[in-house]
UniProtKB/Swiss-Prot annotation:
Family designation: Belongs to the UPF0502 family.
Lineage: Bacteria, Pseudomonadati, Pseudomonadota, Betaproteobacteria, Burkholderiales
PANTHER family: UPF0502 PROTEIN YCEH
Disulfide bonds: none
InterPro entries: DUF480, WH-like_DNA-bd_sf, WH_DNA-bd_sf
Pfam family name, one: DUF480
Protein name: UPF0502 protein Daci_5373
Length: 226
């Protein structure tokens, strides 16, 4: 039966647990699958999390058990320890690239397509922003037979240059409320944050171009010599 977040949405803890498993599988494969303790640490880390959460071991275990019933997590038992891995793409019914984008939205909150491309660098290298947008559009246009949309494009926030995307795995969202900038941040702070994002995107593009040039010339990139 297709996953339908409108009738059986994930809880906030389930979303954090599932996305953390996906993240660690991509970024620290040598430590994956995860023990319960490692998973809780990943769920509660301060970096790359919005919102920051305080998930207990009991809450994480309950979420894992619930996700397993939905075929979204898998328990691997051994003599040394019980570990867990995700079954995100198959459990939700989406390709790997879409699972990456959904996980980032669950971990970091609403983001623009450009931010998603930058933040996914260690997970999956999308060719360009258009590629990211294509997968997002597929998720937004997911048919009713498959369980309906999994993302929504938020209205442009005041002063913002681009619209942000939000996931729907935890059910419907208040798109107008989510589109508003944080109350504590002023327009100047928003503009600065956007400028940083733009600069990071430019740096990523320049690095990719330089790597391509070095590869074409058969040269070794600086700092990579043995």
């Amino acid at each position: 039966m297709p996953f339908d977040p409108r009738t059986t949405p994930l809880t906030a803890v389930e979303a954090r647990v599932l996305a953390t498993l996906m993240e660690k599988a991509r970024t620290v494969p040598d430590s994956y699958p995860l023990t319960l303790n490692a998973l809780v640490t990943g769920c509660n880390q301060k970096s790359s999390r919005d919102p920051v959460m305080e998930v207990s071991e009991g809450e994480a275990q309950e979420a894992l058990d619930s996700l397993r019933l939905r075929t979204m997590s898998v328990q691997i038992s051994s003599a040394r320890a019980t570990r867990w891995e995700h079954n995100f793409p198959r459990g939700v019914g989406v390709p790997d690239q879409s699972a990456v984008l959904l996980s980032l939205l669950m971990l970091r909150g609403p983001q623009t397509a450009g931010e998603l491309r930058i933040n996914s660098e260690r997970w999956h290298r999308f060719a360009d922003i258009s590629s990211v947008e294509a997968f997002l559009e597929e998720l937004r246009e997911r048919s009713e037979e498959k369980g309906g949309p999994l993302v929504v494009l938020l209205p442009r926030a005041p002063g913002a240059r681009e619209q942000r995307w939000a996931h729907l795995l935890c059910g419907p969202v208040d798109v107008n409320a989510m589109a508003q900038p944080p109350a504590a941040a002023g327009a100047r702070g928003d503009a600065l944050a956007q400028r940083v994002v733009d600069l990071e995107a430019q740096v990523q593009q320049l690095q990719a171009r330089l790597a391509h040039v070095y590869a074409q010339l058969g040269l070794e990139e600086p700092g990579q010599s043995s």
